């Protein structure tokens, strides 16, 4: 039986996974935020695809959400993503993270 490699397929994927690991517990970042942290600010969709298929225990994929605080998809189920966020003190209501602007990381200047 072949062992599946846990190494990222390319440099951008590696940068995305590194950026996602930097998101602190109890905070969230959007796919666009992570794309910018990984050096490709217009690659939000690519980040979404990477997060959707990640499934690695060392990457907190559940902290990466869609624009406007929508929780988006998850390699597990949406209910599992909600539970992981709730375990970190975040509240999801109506498919969105409550107080999104306050818990978004990194904080945006107003």
Q: Which residues does each predicted region cover?
A:
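Nucleic acid-binding interface residues in structured DNA/RNA-binding domains
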Residues: 2-110
């Amino acid at each position: 039986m072949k062992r599946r490699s846990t190494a990222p397929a390319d440099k951008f994927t590696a940068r995305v996974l590194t950026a996602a690991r930097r998101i602190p517990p109890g905070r969230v970042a959007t796919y666009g935020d992570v794309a910018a942290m990984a050096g490709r600010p217009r690659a939000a969709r690519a980040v979404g695809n990477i997060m959707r298929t990640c499934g690695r225990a060392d990457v907190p994929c559940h902290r990466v959400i869609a624009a406007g605080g929508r929780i988006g998809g998850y390699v597990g189920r949406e209910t599992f993503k909600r539970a992981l966020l709730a375990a970190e003190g975040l509240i999801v209501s109506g498919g969105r993270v409550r107080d999104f602007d306050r818990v978004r990381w990194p904080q945006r200047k107003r």
